[in-house]
């Protein structure tokens, strides 16, 4: 039932205009206001809108049966409804590309270009939370399977097949290229899965920074601060666009892991945001906290 309710149209604003007519509708509004007043915002970076709607379906059942479902505002919210009436195949006409705005490349004057090939610890520690960086040069990749193998090799005292000292690693498993592509879609994966590896990898390899998606947990943040490293956030949900910044790609280690092998990317102006700086300041903590105070002070929720 919880999942079924998420297929209903977004209509919370209509409900707010006409007012609730039942306890369930009252509860929808209460939860909607309470969650948005937290100031969590899009991608957890702070803002007025955290949820777009709250759905509630009730049915006589045991008191312990309280299913809750959440749907992210991504591809999962796009649905097509059609009827199979036996007259033939149900063909879906692709919308015209003209319905979308043109993609523009304007990062603004405040973005800082970073040369990964000459990166120093001092430069890493100068990055500020929320700052936009444009990465250029050689970047390595590695996600779950690669990290597990790296840590296992370190624990056995073995030499890694690739030198991570002074490098930046991107949490990604790129899709295989097609036609004239250098690499397929290469969007960041959720970074918290690498949290348990972070301290050991930073300490024993000399890695400078990591690039991934979403927030880092307390263990990773403490490790980043301890080792004066940084965590950079790439744009989630834009894997194809991120791949346009990758100018060359080759596998350099753990080829048997397929897409989770360690790749060497050469990137050009790859946009990222400083999400955790060398002092352990996380924008996923400061952003929501700042917006929660704004909402409380100005009653703008």
Which ranges hold each PLM region?
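Non-transmembrane, aqueous-exposed alpha-helical and coiled segments at domain scale
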Residues: 1-107, 203
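Short, charged beta-turn/beta-strand-edge "cap" motif at the junction between a beta-strand
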Residues: 132, 138-142, 278
